[in-house]
């Protein structure tokens, strides 16, 4: 049996109509969304299926929607007799999905928690003052140097190490623009502004992290049933306080996705299953470790094929 891990996507993977085919095949998908809707006080399934997209893309609605989609797919896997993965990891918000699936956090608690996380993130930075950009085709050290030089008293830093040659930067809008230009001058192929309202994982998120810490302290954390590799330290914590602390720091520190995938491969993982909408993490995998294979579990045919292995 191939050693496999489950990886859970973050914001950007949501689309109106996501998981419709899975819901038609597996009733547990809509049942999971009904649980989330009860926790939130509005119909989350209707939002994901009917939109409008600008509502689904509001971070405090995106986050519960993606978490619920991932948990629903994991429940399908479990219900159909799928084996437990060797490890789990989630990209940013996806870390919460991993922690729910590993039994660390109660699902309803997590749904409410990530809604608050979205609101705290939005409140931390006034609309229009923060930005993010993807830097393509430049090494990590050059990007860090460009950010340092472009800051000029403002905040800008690398925040998502997605794969070698694909790093996202975030901070104050003007500083991100200056850093993007500096990266291109240093040899980056592209500096692409991202359509987001919140500059995640940079120092501007510290006020949001302080509020999040208060909410995390109210929630029970259990020991994980499957090791979860965290974003911020690339470690598998088992202690509830250590997991909480990593989630707080995650909000204003970079997502170490490249190192997380390398770590899982070093532990003997050979295949990654992406448990959530889209195929963002599947696409990054080969660029990080070329011996790893990856596939997404968000279509009935893909789920059925994986369950047969």
Swiss-Prot record:
GO terms for biological process: fatty acid biosynthetic process. This is Malonyl CoA-acyl carrier protein transacylase. Signal peptide: none annotated. It comes from Escherichia coli (strain K12). NCBIfam families: fabD (TIGR00128). It catalyses: holo-[ACP] + malonyl-CoA = malonyl-[ACP] + CoA. The active site is at residues 92, 201. Belongs to the FabD family. Pathway: Lipid metabolism; fatty acid biosynthesis. One of its GO terms (molecular function) is [acyl-carrier-protein] S-malonyltransferase activity. Its EC number is 2.3.1.39. Keywords: Acyltransferase, Fatty acid biosynthesis, Fatty acid metabolism, Lipid biosynthesis, Lipid metabolism, Transferase. The gene is fabD. GO terms for cellular component: cytosol.
């Amino acid at each position: 049996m191939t050693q496999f891990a489950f990886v859970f996507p973050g914001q950007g993977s949501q689309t109106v109509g996501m998981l419709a085919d899975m819901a038609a095949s597996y009733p547990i998908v809509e049942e999971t969304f009904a649980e989330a809707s009860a926790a939130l006080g509005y119909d989350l399934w209707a939002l994901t299926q009917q939109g409008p997209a600008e509502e689904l893309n509001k971070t405090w609605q995106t986050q519960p929607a993606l978490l619920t989609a991932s948990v629903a797919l994991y429940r399908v896997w479990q219900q159909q007799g799928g084996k437990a993965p060797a490890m789990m990891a989630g990209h940013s918000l996806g870390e919460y999905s991993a922690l729910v699936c590993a039994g660390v956090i109660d699902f309803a608690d997590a749904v409410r928690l990530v809604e608050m996380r979205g609101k705290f993130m939005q409140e931390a930075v006034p609309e229009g003052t923060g930005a993010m950009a993807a830097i393509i085709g430049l090494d990590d050290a050059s990007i860090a140097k460009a950010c340092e030089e472009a800051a000029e008293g403002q905040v800008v830093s690398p925040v998502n190490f997605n794969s070698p040659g694909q790093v996202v930067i975030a901070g104050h809008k003007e500083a991100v623009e200056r850093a993007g230009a500096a990266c291109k001058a240093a040899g980056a192929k592209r500096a692409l502004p991202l359509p987001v309202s919140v500059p995640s994982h940079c120092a501007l998120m510290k006020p949001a992290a302080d509020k999040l810490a208060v909410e995390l302290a109210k929630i029970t954390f259990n020991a994980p049933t499957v090791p979860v590799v965290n974003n911020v330290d690339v470690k598998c914590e088992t202690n509830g306080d250590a997991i909480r602390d990593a989630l707080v720091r995650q909000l204003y520190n970079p997502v170490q996705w490249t190192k997380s995938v390398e770590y899982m491969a070093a532990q003997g993982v050979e295949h990654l299953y992406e448990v959530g909408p889209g195929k963002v993490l599947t696409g990054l995998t080969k660029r990080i470790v070329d011996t790893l294979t990856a596939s997404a579990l968000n279509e009935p045919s893909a789920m059925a094929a994986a369950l047969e292995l």
